[in-house]
Amino acid sequence: MVDGLSFNLGYSELETSSAEDGASDNNDQHEGTFNLNYAIGAVSIGAQKSVVNASGTSETKYDSEYFGISYAVSDNLSVSYNNIESNKNVDGTDVDQDFDSISLSYTVGGMTIGVLDAEADNASYSAGRTQSARSVQMTVAF
């Protein structure tokens, strides 16, 4: 194995059924994912792929790719960028969602201050819907 390299693989299966008023509805879900992460010095890079197939009253498939990179500027300051591209297919109709974020984190003693700027195109898999968010947070450890 290469120093700083990690790889994960996962699969899950959820089988559910419910009968209400004599009707039967199967809502099975199958999910597979894998990721690859590499850290060298002050830089960490990660990528992930996941696929979710769900059945029920309609066939739904989510196909997502994740990418992130972070850089530790110093022991106290780090910056990171993340991107998620996801496709939702319901009974043959596709919608692509794209999410980008950049964050900055500064730690001193037991206190961390973080700043995040994020934007999603086709947010919540709604074509033409754009959402953006900015946040500042402070965490204190005692």
Predicted regions and their residues:
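Outer-membrane beta-barrel proteins
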Residues: M1-F142
